[in-house]
């Protein structure tokens, strides 16, 4: 598999991958909280006498999916704000990403609220090529509205990626210094988060 990020003015930052079955390149367009996969010819990027020559960078598989997760989170969470009134992507999402270590953890961190708070579904993540491990991590960290918080935490704890990301998520949510005013509901929520954090840190 081959992965690229285009750097020309028109398609700057857009991701391209080689579809082995069709033996053709597809560009992923992400805008207006939607994504699409379209065929793209890379011939102009290889011809020295064109403006597009060499206007791309090669990405590893890890770099590609990390950047794809970042772009999806940024677009699909657009217009949302966190409890501190800060842009959701640059605030909460980025803090959670910075709180984990591995590339897989960071990918799940970027996507950890997409199934609950955006129109993205796990089927979309499958279509976009994310690994089963990453998709399951996102599913496990997404709370089903019908399940209790206790059952939810059990599910999170059973998946290593979901657990690592949830600990980072809780760490950010417990930081009351980011709030302009601290209400009683915030204090109650903090106690809930502290108990959840302790539970997830405990070794079974």
Spans of features found by a protein language model:
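Residue-level detector of beta-propeller blades
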Residues: 5, 52, 58-59
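A short beta-strand micro-motif
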Residues: 2-9
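Active-site helical microenvironments for divalent-metal-assisted chemistry
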Residues: 60-204
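Glycine-centered tight beta-turn/hairpin loop motif at sheet-sheet or coil-to-beta transitions
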Residues: 9-12, 32
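Short N-terminal binding/cap micro-motifs at the start of the first secondary-structure element
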Residues: 12-15, 82-83
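Acidic, low-complexity, intrinsically disordered interaction modules
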Residues: 16-53, 105
């Amino acid at each position: 598999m081959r992965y690229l990020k285009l750097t020309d003015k028109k398609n700057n930052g857009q991701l391209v991958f080689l579809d082995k079955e069709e033996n053709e390149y597809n560009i992923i367009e992400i805008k207006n909280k939607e994504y699409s996969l379209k065929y793209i010819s890379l011939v102009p990027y290889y011809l020295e006498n064109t403006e597009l020559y060499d206007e791309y960078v090669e990405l590893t598989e890890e770099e590609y999916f990390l950047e794809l997760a970042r772009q999806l989170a940024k677009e699909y969470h657009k217009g949302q704000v966190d409890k501190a009134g800060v842009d959701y992507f640059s605030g909460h999402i980025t803090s959670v990403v910075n709180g984990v270590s591995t590339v897989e953890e960071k990918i799940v961190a970027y996507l950890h609220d997409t199934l609950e708070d955006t129109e993205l579904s796990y089927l979309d993540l499958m279509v976009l090529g994310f690994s089963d491990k990453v998709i399951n991590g996102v599913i496990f960290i997404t709370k089903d509205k019908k399940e209790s918080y206790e059952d939810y935490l059990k599910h999170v704890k059973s998946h290593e990626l979901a657990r690592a990301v949830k600990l980072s998520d809780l760490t950010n949510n417990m930081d009351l210094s980011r709030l302009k005013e601290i209400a009683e509901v915030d204090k109650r929520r903090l106690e809930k988060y502290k108990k959840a954090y302790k539970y997830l840190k405990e070794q079974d």
